Amino acid sequence: MPADAARLATAFATTPPLVVLTSNRTREVHDAHKRRCLYHWLQHPDFDREVAILRRRLPDVTEQLAREVARATAKLRTLDLLKPPGVAEAMDWATALHTLGARELDPDVAARTLGAVLKYREDTDRVHAMARGALFGGG
């Protein structure tokens, strides 16, 4: 036993702890573990909520850019992608765009920064093959 560990006291919880496990379903969870869990499925936030999240977490990102990123991310989620983007990817994308000095999400800058929001090459290739304007143009 290390000398430092001998000085530490053992802590006991006065009430049973509440443990929250999250999963993006990238790995299978063993059946024995699943039987001991309660499940609550979360949906992606609606447009206004996602814009609010982006603005709160990334205050330097303009309202317009936050709205365009939220709109484009919602459109990407409707596609048959291996990994549809979540809020974390939307935040990564908005951060990358802001860092590059983008004031709006036009089709060209969107195409150049897809790696921030799409994590699989097949997804990026699929989006590049589509009409970019339909995904990243205005409303």
Show the residue positions of the predicted features:
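C-terminal regulatory/interaction module of P-loop NTP-utilizing enzymes
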Residues: 1-139
